[in-house]
Amino acid sequence: DALPIYKLVLSRSKTIRKDPSFSPGKAFFAAVERYIRSYVYLCHTPETGTWMGGTPEILLSGEKGDWQTVALAGTQSLRDGKLPKSWDHKNWREQQLVASYIRRQLSTLGITPEEKGPYSARAGEVSHLKSDFFFSLPNPEKLGDVLQLLHPTPAVCGLPKEEAYHFIIENEGYDRSYYSGFIGWLDPKGKTDLYVNLRCMNILPQTFTLYAGGGLLAASQLEDEWQETEDKLDTMRRIVGNL
């Protein structure tokens, strides 16, 4: 029997018209300046088209024996550009679910990580609760095993993972494309930096398609969750609208 879903991340896209004077290069450098604590990218391939995004969520980062991942969840808007002084129970609970998931997944490989946090961390126009996890991975050939265990994280899917994944596929109603995948540099013999592809956009000839999502718990207020996705979409909308 399927287990009950106790966290679910649903997302949406928003398409806006592109100004004829838009420059991807200028937008990228504007994003780099604005989102200094995020991984910012501008990527084009014939297969994927052109994508740009900024994400604060490390999926897996490290080299040799030293590795890191993060639990990033809970969202509040900045107040006068400052981090919040307190968080409600719903946001704490959401972040703790992600942290517990990471501990549990790593433990299947015999890994007990060192932890730092949770603490408030800025990401564009919003803030999140963040915990850092540091661990050793003597055999770099295990990178694929770690990635398979961590992805998709509860920050983009839900818990239990399989039940949430199938609910999203059957009910979300659109194709996420590359949103909520992971992006970065993978080098088992050198430095690897992989991030969850959160706030992002697909740059098309006449339009941008922006993507964002929000985590739903039993205590969630739907109007607040909708506004959270608006705040996240604003992160990218400000970049393309203020050049």
Task: Cite the ranges covered by each PLM segment.
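A short glycine-rich, hydrophobically flanked beta-strand micro-motif that places a catalytic Asp/Glu
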Residues: L10, Y41-L42, I111, R176-G184
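Conserved hydrophobic core element of enzyme catalytic domains
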Residues: S136-L243
